[in-house]
Swiss-Prot record:
One cellular component term from this protein's GO annotations in UniProt: cytoplasm
Keywords, ordered alphabetically: ATP-binding, Chemotaxis, Cytoplasm, Kinase, Nucleotide-binding, Phosphoprotein, Transferase, Two-component regulatory system
SMART domains hit by this protein: CheW, H-kinase_dim, HATPase_c, HPT
Residues of the CheW-like domain: 663-798
One MF annotation (Gene Ontology) recorded for this entry: ATP binding
Organism in which the protein naturally occurs: Treponema pallidum (strain Nichols)
InterPro entries: Bact_Chemotaxis_CheA (IPR051315), CheA-like_dim (IPR004105), CheA-like_homodim_sf (IPR037006), CheA-like_P2_sf (IPR037052), CheA_P2-bd (IPR010808), CheW-like_dom_sf (IPR036061), CheW-lke_dom (IPR002545), CheY-binding_CheA (IPR035891)
Top EC category: transferase
Highest taxon listed in the record's lineage: Bacteria
Protein name from the UniProt record: Chemotaxis protein CheA
Domain Histidine kinase per the UniProt entry, residue ranges: 418-661
Highest classification ranks of the organism: Bacteria, Pseudomonadati, Spirochaetota, Spirochaetia, Spirochaetales
Catalytic activity: ATP + protein L-histidine = ADP + protein N-phospho-L-histidine
Gene from which the chain derives: cheA
Length: 812
């Protein structure tokens, strides 16, 4: 069943918004639960947890995910007990909260997949309830708002005289805020815009009305036209049930006055009376006594019903209109800094990208500048048209004057022949010829002015387009905290399973990179983290014998280096034994026994498929199927992964990636008549060599660079391109490219230059082209294929392996 079946088609956007926001709330819950595990007295973290659960519960009710809303009620009860210090936070409570969070994730993923969550959670709900005090509690499934005192329900039944002489709740005598918990009051204060006033409307309904069970919904719908309904008592779920409620209290925020609000809420034959009390925002942060005084009453008049727009639930089942101002609609997010944190998950809307409004404003400003440049270029086009007309006129006059000049040449010659002074005749001819060329003077001046203005406009256009490109790319940039925030839970659970003590340190989580890159980094980093926990960091007793602290340290760090992002996963564990790696490589046939490797080269062997030095296989790792996946993933992103280690000091994985995959800087090269692009990030250096500098080893071409032998690949042969041997026979251009410690020289016909390259994916029959990563359209309209350096390096490595096997076969 598609998600749209749960709501009408008009609320499809509401579902998308809910899933996007649910990601943030789940991340908030998980991160802060781990915080209170370390520091149970952290009140800010407790409040954040309660706030996130409260918001998630309300959002679930909005999109009719009742199983999620009901279960989150139970979780919220336990959180309320923690917040009120009735429940002590210990390991068991944290485990229960994390287990409940896993169920919430499963519910979200199930709904995103098209169906409700079918598993029975009654046992888990019972465990949640078991921590609550036996008396004075209100079951979460039966309430939408926390009640501050046992008399709160009765408090709503104060009396006032309505228009028909009946008695209605008198909010002046019974404060509306006494119906709310301290948290509910704080939440009201947080979500109300400063320009809005808050009112508590107590509405009494006519039981004699044939449709009395929907009276609460009718008033809610009417209020949407002039106010934002923040909370209701009873909660919104209860209003939807087939049950008559004599009194309902609506907490609303609006820019309208109390008279207008009360008139809208008064519906003939539905309501008997409406009382309105204004709620001061300052009082929302003031703890109330059991019968504290608050509010000024205004008797309600009667008024017509105004139809409103659709509504969304804010929290606790209370709905908020879809047409709310942005500052209200966005208030469900706990804080501005949290709104930028999103985690990748199966239920999240991967296409949703939250962008800082300042970045949008910056782009709009640039767009306005492009309008100015457009007008300037249009003016230049008109001026060039005028200059062209001037040129045509001057050209016509020039031809006519030149014809007349040549017609007069015989006359000048006749004068010399008749004995006139030759110098005088020559001066006359020169004077007439100069007059002919002076015709172009005005054209030349006009052309210079037009070219100068056009050049200035072109420079401004280049500047603005560059800034626009940078600004648009920044829109896609998201903080890496979106994935870093996933690992505290992973480290906690794995370290407990492995019975190790591990402290996770995260640095540089504000570092930004392209969203598409972030989504593809989760698994590679996860493999590195699991490898460090399982193979790197030792058990506490082993660390103690080595003189290390019992608690190991795992570091996650992100930083920028130019146009690259560097991600490090480091531990202070046992490190990698180089000799053990070499021995294992020889056993697996990956390495020849007589081959001498540097430490760096030996460390790269651990990325070979199926390679593992572990003597046992665990649930975490040891099968050798992890690090080769890391390497494959990272190289697919045009990045590199390296490992550095020292025995008994630790291991460090270093991942380097371009900030974005959409636009790269490329080195344009020519092979035959074809132009290719090589990512600048992969280019080490370039050379121009003579044919005699090329040597052969086992029928493979190599050349020497500072006493280092570099393998050569002729791109013309690799891609099947015919070249003119007469042109390429004497000198060759070689571009040395590399990743990690691997290098190869690409032999090309010419180096064209550097250029920003927009990557377009290849489709259909071109997707399997070896050595090609994509394509780009150049400034002249031609297509340039982008070289996949990683695949070319693999090709070079395979050639070396084949050559080594041939040598070994010859020896044997």
């Amino acid at each position: 069943m598609p998600m749209s079946d749960y709501l009408d088609a008009g609320n499809e956007e509401l579902l998308k918004d809910f899933f996007s926001e649910a990601e943030q709330q789940v991340e908030q819950l998980e991160s802060n639960i781990l915080v209170i595990e370390q520091d149970p007295t952290n009140r800010d973290a407790v409040d954040e947890i309660f706030r996130a659960a409260h918001t998630l519960k309300g959002g679930a009710a909005t999109v009719e995910m009742h199983e999620l809303s009901g279960f989150t009620h139970a979780v919220e009860d336990l959180l309320d007990g923690i917040r009120s210090e009735k429940v002590t936070v210990d390991g068991a409570v944290v485990d229960l909260l994390l287990t409940s969070l896993d169920v919430i994730k499963a519910m979200l993923e199930s709904r995103a997949g098209g169906g409700p969550y079918a598993e029975d959670v009654s046992d888990l709900v019972a465990r949640l309830r078991s921590y609550l005090p036996a008396s004075g509690t209100v079951p979460g499934a039966a309430r939408g708002l926390s009640v501050s005192s046992p008399n709160a329900a009765e408090a709503a039944k104060g009396t006032a005289v309505g228009e028909d002489g009946t008695e209605a709740p008198q909010v002046g005598r019974v404060p509306p805020l006494s119906l709310l918990s301290e948290y509910d009051r704080l939440e009201l204060r947080e979500i109300v815009p400063p320009e809005h006033s808050v009112y508590a409307l107590t509405v009494r309904f006519d039981e004699s009305n044939l449709m009395n069970t929907v009276g609460g919904i009718q008033v809610f719908t009417a209020l949407k036209s002039c106010a934002s309904v923040l909370k209701t008592v009873p909660d919104f779920d209860a209003l939807y049930q087939d049950m008559f409620h004599e009194y309902v209290v609506y907490f609303v925020s609006t820019v309208q006055d109390s008279v207008c609000v009360s008139q809208v809420a008064s519906i003939p034959d539905v309501t008997l009376s409406v009382s309105v009390a204004e709620v001061a925002l300052a009082d929302l942060c003031t703890p109330l006594s059991e019968h504290g005084e608050l509010g000024v009453c205004a008797d309600a008049g009667t008024g017509g019903v105004s139809e409103g727009s659709g509504a969304a639930v804010r929290s606790g089942g209370e709905r908020v209109p879809n047409s709310l101002p942005k500052q209200v609609a966005g208030c469900a997010v706990p804080s501005a800094k949290d709104s930028s944190k999103a985690t990748s998950s199966g239920y999240g809307s991967g296409s949703v990208l939250r962008v800082d409004a300042k970045r949008i404003d910056y782009l709009l400003n640039l767009v306005s500048e492009t309008v100015i440049i457009k007008a300037s270029l249009n003016q230049s086009a008109l001026e060039f048209g005028e200059v062209y007309t001037l040129f045509q006129n001057a050209n016509g006059a020039y031809k006519e004057r030149l014809r007349k000049f040549f017609d007069r040449v015989p006359a000048y010659l006749e004068k010399v022949k008749n004995g006139q002074d030759a110098d005088a005749v020559r001066k006359g001819m020169i004077a007439e010829a100069v007059g002919v060329f002076d015709i172009f003077s005005s054209f030349e001046n006009g052309l210079k002015q037009s070219v100068t203005k056009f050049r200035s406009s072109a420079q401004n256009l280049g500047r603005i387009s560059g800034e626009l490109q940078e600004g648009v790319m920044k829109i896609r940039m998201v903080p890496i905290s979106q994935i870093f925030s996933r690992y505290p839970r992973v480290v906690r659970d794995l370290s407990r399973d492995l019975r190790k003590e591990v402290r996770l340190v995260i640095e540089g989580e504000e570092t930004e990179l392209d969203k598409s890159v972030v989504e593809d980094l989760l698994d590679p980093i996860m493999h590195c983290v699991r490898n460090s926990l399982d193979h790197g960091i030792e058990a506490p007793e082993v660390r103690a014998r080595s003189g290390k602290p019992a608690q190991g340290t795992l570091l996650l760090r992100a930083s920028n280096e130019g146009n690259m992002i560097v991600i490090e996963v480091a531990d202070d564990g046992r490190g990698i034994d180089v000799e053990a790696v070499k021995t294992k490589a020889v056993e697996r046939g990956v390495l020849h026994p007589g081959k001498n490797l540097t430490e760096v080269e030996a460390f790269q062997l651990i990325f070979a498929p199926g390679f593992s030095t572990s003597r046992s296989v665990s649930n975490v790792s040891g099968r050798g199927v992890g690090l080769d996946v890391v390497k494959t993933h990272i190289e697919r992103l045009n990045g590199t992964v390296s490992v550095f280690s020292e025995v008994q000091k630790g291991t460090r994985f270093v991942i380097k990636l371009p900030l974005t995959l959409a636009i790269i800087q490329g080195l344009l090269i020519r092979v035959g008549q074809e132009v290719y692009s090589i990512p600048i990030a992969s280019v080490i250096e370039s050379h121009r060599i003579k044919s005699e500098e090329i040597n052969r080893i086992d029928n493979y071409e190599v050349f020497n660079v500072r006493n280092e032998v570099i393998s050569l690949l002729r791109l013309d042969r690799l891609f099947g391109i015919s070249c003119d041997d007469e042109v390429t026979g004497q000198y060759h251009y070689v571009v040395i490219v590399g990743a990690a410690e691997k290098k190869v020289g690409l032999m090309v016909d010419a180096l064209i230059g550097e250029e920003d390259v927009v990557i377009k994916p290849l489709r259909d029959q071109f997707t399997s082209s070896p050595g090609i990563a994509g394509a780009s359209i150049l400034g002249d309209g031609s297509v340039s294929l982008i070289i996949d350096v990683g695949q070319l390096l693999e090709l070079g490595l395979k050639r070396e392996i084949l050559a080594r096997e041939r040598r070994e076969a010859t020896v044997w």
